[in-house]
Amino acid sequence: MPRRPDLNHVLVIGSGPILIGQAAEFDYSGTQACRVLRAEGLQVTLINSNPATIMTDPEYADHTYVEPITAEFVEKVIAQQAERGNKIDALLATLGGQTALNTAVKLSENGALERYGVELIGADFEAIQRGEDRQKFKDIVTKVGGESARSRVCFTMDEVRDTVADLGLPVVVRPSFTMGGLGSGMAYSAEDVERMAGDGLAASPSANVLIEESIYGWKEYELELMRDGHDNVVVVCSIENFDPMGVHTGDSVTVAPAMTLTDREYQTMRTLGIEILREVGVDTGGCNIQFAVNPKDGRLIVIEMNPRVSRSSALASKATGFPIAKIAAKLAIGYTLDEIVNDITKETPACFEPTLDYVVVKAPRFAFEKFPGADGTLTTTMKSVGEAMSLGRNFIEALGKVMRSLETGRAGFWTGPDPEGSVDEVLTRLHTATDGRLYDIEYALRLGATVEQVAVASGVDPWFVEQIGRLVALRAELIDAPVLGEELLRRSKHNGLSDRQIAALRPELAGEMGVRVLRQRLGIHPVFKTVDTCAAEFEARTPYHYSSYELDPSAETEVAPQAERPKVLILGSGPNRIGQGIEFDYSCVHAATTLTEAGFETVMINCNPETVSTDYDTADRLYFEPLTFEDVLEIYYAEQASGEGGPGVVGVIVQLGGQTPLGLAERLEKAGVPIVGTLPEAIDLAEDRGEFGEVLRRAGLPAPRFGMATSFDQARRIAAEIGYPVLVRPSYVLGGRGMEIVYDEETLEGYITRATELSPEHPVLVDRFLEDAIEIDVDALCDGTEVYIGGVMEHIEEAGIHSGDSACALPPVTLGRSDIEAVRRATEAIAFGIGVVGLLNVQYALKDDVLYVLEANPRASRTVPFVSKATAVPLAKACARIMLGATIAQLREEGVLASTGDGAVTARNAPVAVKEAVLPFHRFRKADGSQIDSLLGPEMKSTGEVMGIAADFGSAFAKSQTAAYGSLPAQGTVFVSVANRDKRSLVFPVKRLADLGFRVLATEGTAEMLRRNGIPCEEVRKHFQEFSEGLPQMSAVDAIKAGHVDMVINTPYGNSGPRIDGYEIRSAAVSMNIPCVTTVQGASAAVQGIEAGIRGDIGVRSLQELHSALGS
């Protein structure tokens, strides 16, 4: 049937900030949905708090609200549209992850949808409840003849204890209505049960947890299914987890299609999946169902389902070429599967199930190095921050490609230090899942362990272990062969080995380039295959490619000739990680769309299945490949060959994808690849402290005093000369990796030992640390003759907090005109001094009216999307055009940039935008189960960001906090404990809170200072102080854990008892999910936000309205 005529206006809820467990896959899903709905003639309103997303670009919806995703704010949007006579007919919440689903449930429960006559489409309220509520779902599984793990839903700790007594330990604890396994875990002891179930009851919006028998070690599978209003069902993809049950599927290596299922098991799963889908009532959309199989007896149970588009849906979409989110959106508005045409073949309908003639492997990317002390054990709580995907003609080829796609410094096995230990020690280690288990499996086999021993120890299916065993045998062949001949080299490449891996085993070839030269001499090159959804049964019309090394030398590539248009290759940013997230993907997508419009053929290279850049119709051609020198160069050659007789590849863009492509620029240029925009030598100049310092000296721009050290003695002399505190860091890092503020010589010695291990080929930088300075961030464009300031941002936290973790405001709220003019002059001098062509980000610190240059990055920064949303200027699009020859003057004429002026000086009526970082501290614990410290510093720790935008700073800040962490309290109790240096600065913010009616708790020293300043407060004991006569009975931590505190203000002390006390206070605040402010500036901003909330005048406005006002 055609689309429903009664639907004219649809509200789409996005997923908000990038979190562990809910990442960029929902930007990909939501972007697809918005495009489809608008193409169908529907009016679309979107709400999403994440400015780094493509979906929040104003062109993807009629009304785009960058607002917190809460029931309160969504209702404000619905009400505003209704007041304007523009009633919203339907709410589509199945494409925004768990956040959107939970918000939709609240809007149903509080009556808002009924009040405004808004229908839930995709999955209705009852379907969401049946799919998400553990007990209801278990009942459905039983009804359709399936089996669940023995379990019980518990609402109290007493019920939890009774259930554990019945089931026996170990048990799995799973909260309802959470994502990424938040709050879940394997409990081996009564103490584990108390902690995990307590956390789970707190994490679950419905305050219940499922206590389940342990199925640890079973094999895990997933099915992606879709159903339409006529009860047509398709199984889009089967996915098998390499890791057994007990490891969250988001942290497991996964493989599609499933490799080790028997046909009978698959058919049983398929039948059960379809019956469950029908019974739950997801009648217009997609869902994901997880199963477990006992490898000993074949017992099959159903674990859970997601009645929405999920992380696995994005993976399945990229793995098969079947656009699940796009089709789900069409099904939600009334179409049936047989009416929807497959985009890739342009002739088969969507009711044709995809067929794969290749293997897909996804691997997680972890960031444990960012959280010292965090337990690296993989459990049912997801901990990975990103993922990479690869395609190959066999499992082992795809595995090799995905391992080098993760960008951990290795190119697969044998390209880093071997794991430690004897065969018995490695087998013992394999009983516990960690992020290094692939390397442990290979090493155990290499040391002589049998496939069966490794499979038993790790719980990994013997078939997968056997495949890695084939690589161990191949390694021995490569080492032992007297000469590396064509047959062995071709077989090595067919099995996924990179040139770097082969070079590591054949020293006589003198490195990766030696292997490359040998390959070229022997005529061994990859062929490029096509993802077509139908195993070549029908012709693919969409060029979506992956590489493979065939054993047959006559195998042909499938890259179609295209000689008419000049080609531009865009290097993406690879897997998301802390320091390099979707902000960079945003810039790559903008480059692809704007350059296609400008007449170029755009070619995207990336390996991240979550992103919009790897959608098959973002660029003219897509290569799903690792971002390594070897892989990129082969694509360049393939594209040059396909463009023979025409202009060919005129440029490769490395400036937009973060540090990953920048790291390849120099080698690619030396290999003859044309790099456009800022040249590699200019990129190196900006990174080299000595050369960059010379640029600043010539321009008369001050920078903090610094020195370079390769030993502790050198570092000690430099630190003594410039004075403590100092900021120490290795060079060439993104996200502040390895950075630390050091206050004394003892700490410096420990740091130098660690840092030189981190980056032995580069010296350690020792900078004077500017305490209490205001940090400023600038994004600018330069075409070689003119500089255009995109935006000037003022950081809310002082210098010393990584810019990616600091909240910032645009326009700046305390800088004067003379400060901004100084920023402009400095930015122009730096842009011309380096030789920037494209984007430039500069960070400054303003202290005692002196503007210091901290660093300059001649590339797209993570703030580009935020600045673009706040100012209505598409910086990434302008950058792409400038790199390919356009001038700023030309872009002004075309209306891409403002005809006069730029973003340095904003209009008086310009709204204030606040960007806030989202931090994942609640995801990580130490091995003993205690929280890790939530203190911020120069090393970046945030996974994502939100934006609040309003007429004044207080309202914008309040929105940003609500979007990131939940509403600031309007009343209640605030606990204050601050370092001596901060006490004077905090008098006014705390007095204002007291005046607003807040009860103030404080520790002894802080309480004394507050009372002297006329602020009433109650005293609590420090956590490390034993209770004795004369001390308050309740400690600060006790008060927080008892639920008596609504906000914490705690700035760090030195390294003694109070420092430990501060850690305990902050950890307690994180565990209780209450706001915890760790800087003076943050406290002042929070007070302004609280005042705005109490005033009650925080409204909503769409970006379209805001941008229209900016242009008028």
Curated annotation (Swiss-Prot):
Query: Binding residues for ATP 1, per the UniProt record?
Result: R134, R174, G180, G181, E213, I215, E220, G246, V247, H248, Q290, E304
| Sequence segments annotated as region (Oligomerization domain) | 408-559
The molecular function terms of the Gene Ontology recorded here are: ATP binding; carbamoyl-phosphate synthase (ammonia) activity; carbamoyl-phosphate synthase (glutamine-hydrolyzing) activity; metal ion binding
The UniProt annotation places Mg(2+) 2 binding at E304, N306
Q: Which residues form the MGS-like domain?
A: 966-1112
> In the record's cofactor note, how is the cofactor described as bound?
Binds 4 Mg(2+) or Mn(2+) ions per subunit.
What this protein catalyses is:
hydrogencarbonate + L-glutamine + 2 ATP + H2O = carbamoyl phosphate + L-glutamate + 2 ADP + phosphate + 2 H(+)
Residues annotated for Mn(2+) 2 binding in this entry: E304, N306
Tree of life domain: Bacteria
User: Could you name the Gene Ontology cellular component terms for this entry?
Assistant: cytoplasm
Q: What does this protein do?
A: Large subunit of the glutamine-dependent carbamoyl phosphate synthetase (CPSase). CPSase catalyzes the formation of carbamoyl phosphate from the ammonia moiety of glutamine, carbonate, and phosphate donated by ATP, constituting the first step of 2 biosynthetic pathways, one leading to arginine and/or urea and the other to pyrimidine nucleotides.
Q: Which NCBIfam families match?
A: CPSaseII_lrg (TIGR01369), PRK05294.1 (NF003671), PRK12815.1 (NF009455)
Its subunit composition reads:
Composed of two chains; the small (or glutamine) chain promotes the hydrolysis of glutamine to ammonia, which is used by the large (or ammonia) chain to synthesize carbamoyl phosphate. Tetramer of heterodimers (alpha,beta)4.
This chain's protein is named Carbamoyl phosphate synthase large chain
Which gene produces this protein? carB
